[in-house]
């Protein structure tokens, strides 16, 4: 969204140049929504079900606490509908519920660094989350695990590889009138 983008003026300029902008949001009056050609109204998070994966690698279960109204759609419903509208129906046959989608995701991770084949949908319901990798057959012994504690990295050499980018200059100068710079937490690579 524009409000939290690293440089929202650049975002606005880019949005104005787009041929077509789709925004999915629970509000229709956001600054970003004002630029869109198509607004997909979404149910708020209190009505959603599914599994979230954060940047700490933690899978958490999102349980709805409010009922959806008739014709109200969640993110999942919207993305599933778009997929079907694009002719992907056969590929999405197994995706009837968020649980089904999770099972499909889980199968895709087998043997990968992010393997979650040991995570079961029900184990996430009342937990504080499970960090990947968590392979089938592993036992969850602790609440938090650190990735690469064993010094084994997913690189050809097995060693850590650091990738960095040059720090961009601050787009605004501090002044007496505006002595503080605001950091949204977003960077050019991701958000942490």
Report residues per predicted region.
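Generic alpha-helical secondary structure signal
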Residues: 9, 13, 77, 96-99
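A cross-kingdom feature strongest in bacterial/archaeal respiratory oxidoreductases
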Residues: 1-70, 103-192
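Non-catalytic, well-ordered alpha-helical segments in soluble enzyme domains
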Residues: 76-93
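Short amphipathic alpha-helical surface patches that mediate protein-protein
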Residues: 87, 99-106
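Short coil/turn segments at secondary-structure boundaries
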Residues: 93-98, 117-120
């Amino acid at each position: 969204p524009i409000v939290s983008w690293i440089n929202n003026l650049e975002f606005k300029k880019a949005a104005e140049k787009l041929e077509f902008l789709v925004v999915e949001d629970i509000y229709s009056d956001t600054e970003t929504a004002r630029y869109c050609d198509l607004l997909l109204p979404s149910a708020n998070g209190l009505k959603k079900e599914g599994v979230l994966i954060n940047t700490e690698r933690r899978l958490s279960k999102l349980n709805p606490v409010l009922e959806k109204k008739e014709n109200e759609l969640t993110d999942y419903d919207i993305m599933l509908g778009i997929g079907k509208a694009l002719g992907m129906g056969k590929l999405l046959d197994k995706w009837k519920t968020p649980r089904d989608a999770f099972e499909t995701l889980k199968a895709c991770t087998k043997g990968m660094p992010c393997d979650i084949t040991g995570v079961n949908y029900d184990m996430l319901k009342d937990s504080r989350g499970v960090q990947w990798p968590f392979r089938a057959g592993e036992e969850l012994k602790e609440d938090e695990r650190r990735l690469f504690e064993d010094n084994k990295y997913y690189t050809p050499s097995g060693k850590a590889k650091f990738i960095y980018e040059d720090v961009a200059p601050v787009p605004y100068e501090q002044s007496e009138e505006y002595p503080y710079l605001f950091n949204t937490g977003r960077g050019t690579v991701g958000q942490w």
